Amino acid sequence: MLSSTDFTFASWELVVRVDHPNEEQQKDVTLRVSGDLHVGGVMLKLVEQINISQDWSDFALWWEQKHCWLLKTHWTLDKYGVQADAKLLFTPQHKMLRLRLPNLKMVRLRVSFSAVVFKAVSDICKILNIRRSEELSLLKPSGDYFKKKKKKDKNNKEPIIEDILNLESSPTASGSSVSPGLYSKTMTPIYDPINGTPASSTMTWFSDSPLTEQNCSILAFSQPPQSPEALADMYQPRSLVDKAKLNAGWLDSSRSLMEQGIQEDEQLLLRFKYYSFFDLNPKYDAVRINQLYEQARWAILLEEIDCTEEEMLIFAALQYHISKLSLSAETQDFAGESEVDEIEAALSNLEVTLEGGKADSLLEDITDIPKLADNLKLFRPKKLLPKAFKQYWFIFKDTSIAYFKNKELEQGEPLEKLNLRGCEVVPDVNVAGRKFGIKLLIPVADGMNEMYLRCDHENQYAQWMAACMLASKGKTMADSSYQPEVLNILSFLRMKNRNSASQVASSLENMDMNPECFVSPRCAKRHKSKQLAARILEAHQNVAQMPLVEAKLRFIQAWQSLPEFGLTYYLVRFKGSKKDDILGVSYNRLIKIDAATGIPVTTWRFTNIKQWNVNWETRQVVIEFDQNVFTAFTCLSADCKIVHEYIGGYIFLSTRSKDQNETLDEDLFHKLTGGQD
C-alpha cells in the first residue's frame, strides 16, 4: 500500500481547460492524478474542483494533441497514454452547428461532436423528419461554394439578414436522445400523400418538439424561386474537373465532427450523398421528397448534371407548377386538414406496397419468360464513315439482345448477341423531331463498344429502353419494376409533347413568375424572356393537373432518367498512366472517363468486385475484380478515403430490403467503409 509520500511521488499535475457554459473564456483547472486513475475519476475530480452545481453529463474530455475524445471512461490515463504534457479540454459533446439543407434553407441545431458522423447524421435526420438517413451525409463546402460571397465578405460569414431556422432546443445539452419531431407513437411521421402537409394528429402528442408544424412546412414545401441575379451568383461547374471539386468535402462517416476539425457553429451542407433512394413514400416522406426534389432542382439549375434544352424546359415547367401549388393558400392551410388515422395509414401503405402482383397472374409471371421482338435500326460508329442506320430484326430476352438480318432467320444464329449487364444506357431522344434512340456503351476487355438503336415510335422506345435499363442492372423484364418503368418513360415523353399555341397565349399574360428563375443561366441567355415563358407554359400544359407531391416525384423521376444521374466524379490517376482521368462512382458501378472528352473508357460493376482496400502509405485505392482483374488509382481531387467510403457505402445500401425494419446494421456499414487508417 502506497504511503502519502509515495503517492505524491507517483502522481503528477494535469492541467485541464474547462468550457464553462456561462462564461466566454475557458479556464484552466489543475488536478493531481496518477496513471492508474480512470477517465471517469478525472472528470469526477474536475466537477468537484469546479464546484458549480449543474448537469455535467454531456461533458467529456477532448485530447487536443491526439485529436481524439476520451470516451471510454473506464480506461486509465496510462492506457490512453495521457501524461503531464497532455492538453485536455473538458467540453460539451453536443454543440451548435449550422446546416444548409438541399432547399438552401439554413437550420441551426445542437449536434453531437463526439459521435461518428454516420450516427450524428442519423440524429439530425430524426429531428428533421427525414427517413433513411443512411442516404445522406455532411459536406464541407469548398472555396468555390463561397466564391461570389468572397467579393462581398472576406470572412465568408453568412449575411446577417438571412432567416435561420433555429432548432437549438434539440437534443438537450445533457445528451439525451433526439426529439421525435413529427413522428407518431411508432416513430413514423405521417403526411397527406397528395400535398405533403403533416397530419395534425401527430402534432398533439409531442408539443415540445423543436420541429413545430410551421417549421415542418418550411422543410416540406418548396422555397420561392431565386432571382436570375442570385442564380448567376452561384457556383456553376463548367467541366468534369469542376464537378469533381464539388465532391471533395464529404466528411468521414467513421470519425466525429471534432476529430475532423469542425468548429462549433460552423456551416456544413446536409446532402443526399448516395443516389439510391429506398422506399420513397408520400405518406411518410414529405420532407424527404421535398429535400430530394430541391437537390435535384439545384443540380439542374446550376448544371451540375447535363440535360438537353428540351429536358430543361420540362424541368422548368414542373418547377413552375410546384412553385404555384406551394404558394397557393390551399396547400398551406393546415387548419382544414382532417386527421389521419395511423392504423388506416399503415394498412393503406401495406396495400400500396403489395399492389404489385395479383394472385391470378402469379403463375403466369413465374412460367412466362418475357421477350421483345421487333424491327429496329442499328448504327455502330466507325471513324470516317457517315452515320447510317440499318434495319435488323432484334430479340431481347433475359439480359441479352441479339439481332438477325430479318425475321425469317430468327431460328438460326444471330449476327451478334450482346449481354447488356453492366452497360451504359443513354437516351437519345428528340420528341419534336420524332427521334427515339437508345445509345448503348457495352463494356469489353479493352474499353467500351458503342452502338445506337433507333425506334419507330414512343411505345416501342419505352419498352426497349426499359428493358435495356433493367438489363444493365442485371434484371430481366420479369422483374416487377419493368412495367412501371415503361409507364414512367412514356409519361416523361408525353410531358415533352408540344401543345397548341392558343392555350399558351392565353396563359402567357397570367404567368406571375420570372421564367429565368426556372432554367440555368446559360439557357436563359439563349432566349428572350417572353419566348422562354411561352415555351415553359407550353410544357406546363402537360403537367398542369398534377398534385404537388406527384409533381415533385415526377421531377425526381425525370432527374433519374438523365444519362449522368447518380454519377459522382473524382479526378484520379490510374496506376501506370501518365495522364489524369475522371472516376465516376455510381450506385452499381465505377466508370473510368476521359477527362478531356468526357467519354467513358471502362466500366467495372460492383457485383464483380472481390475486394477493395486502401494503401494508406501511398494513398492508393486498389480494387480486385473477378477473373484476376486489378485496378489501382490515386485520388487527386479528394482524399482516397472518400472514394473508398463511396464504394463500401453503395454496397451497404444494396443490402437493404423492405422485409427489414428501419434499424440499420451500423457495424456492417463501418466494416465496409471504414478502412484501416
Swiss-Prot record:
List the membrane topology term(s): Peripheral membrane protein
Domain PH, residue spans: 377-473
The protein's matches in CDD domains, at most eight in alphabetical order, are given as:
FERM_B-lobe, FERM_C_fermitin, FERM_F0_KIND1, FERM_F1_KIND1, PH_fermitin
Q: Which family does it belong to?
A: Belongs to the kindlin family.
One Pfam entry name: Kindlin_2_N
Indicate the principal place this protein occupies in or around the cell.
Answer: cytoplasm
Organism lineage: Eukaryota, Metazoa, Chordata, Craniata, Vertebrata
Q: In which tissues is it expressed?
A: Expressed in brain, skeletal muscle, kidney, colon, adrenal gland, prostate, and placenta. Weakly or not expressed in heart, thymus, spleen, liver, small intestine, bone marrow, lung and peripheral blood leukocytes. Overexpressed in some colon and lung tumors. In skin, it is localized within the epidermis and particularly in basal keratocytes. Not detected in epidermal melanocytes and dermal fibroblasts.
Reproduce the free-text note on domains from the UniProt record: The FERM domain is not correctly detected by PROSITE or Pfam techniques because it contains the insertion of a PH domain. The FERM domain contains the subdomains F1, F2 and F3. It is preceded by a F0 domain with a ubiquitin-like fold. The F0 domain is required for integrin activation and for localization at focal adhesions.
Assembly and partners? Interacts with the cytoplasmic domain of integrins ITGB1 and ITGB3.
Q: Which GO terms describe its cellular component?
A: cell junction; cell periphery; cytoplasm; cytoskeleton; cytosol; focal adhesion; ruffle membrane
Q: Which Gene3D superfamilies match?
A: Phosphatidylinositol 3-kinase Catalytic Subunit, Chain A, domain 1 (3.10.20.90), Pleckstrin-homology domain (PH domain)/Phosphotyrosine-binding domain (PTB) (2.30.29.30)
Induction trigger: By TGFB1.
Gene label: FERMT1
A molecular function (GO) term: integrin binding
Q: Which InterPro entries does UniProt cross-reference here?
A: Band_41_domain (IPR019749), FERM_2 (IPR035963), FERM_central (IPR019748), Kindlin/fermitin (IPR037843), Kindlin_2_N (IPR040790), PH-like_dom_sf (IPR011993), PH_domain (IPR001849), PH_Kindlin/fermitin (IPR037837)
State the organism named in the record: Homo sapiens
Residue list for modification Phosphoserine: S170, S179, S361
Q: What does this protein do?
A: Involved in cell adhesion. Contributes to integrin activation. When coexpressed with talin, potentiates activation of ITGA2B. Required for normal keratinocyte proliferation. Required for normal polarization of basal keratinocytes in skin, and for normal cell shape. Required for normal adhesion of keratinocytes to fibronectin and laminin, and for normal keratinocyte migration to wound sites. May mediate TGF-beta 1 signaling in tumor progression.
Q: What are the GO BP annotations of this UniProt entry?
A: basement membrane organization; cell adhesion; cell-matrix adhesion; establishment of epithelial cell polarity; integrin-mediated signaling pathway; keratinocyte migration; keratinocyte proliferation; negative regulation of canonical Wnt signaling pathway
Record's keyword terms, sorted: Cell adhesion, Cell junction, Cell membrane, Cell projection, Cytoplasm, Cytoskeleton, Disease variant, Membrane, Phosphoprotein
Q: What is this protein called?
A: Fermitin family homolog 1
Which clinical disorder is mentioned? Answer: Kindler syndrome: An autosomal recessive skin disorder characterized by skin blistering, photosensitivity, progressive poikiloderma, and extensive skin atrophy. Additional clinical features include gingival erosions, ocular, esophageal, gastrointestinal and urogenital involvement, and an increased risk of mucocutaneous malignancy.
Where's it found, cell-wise? Cytoplasm, Cytoskeleton; Cell junction, Focal adhesion; Cell projection, Ruffle membrane
Domain (FERM): residue spans on this chain: 96-653
State the superkingdom. Answer: Eukaryota
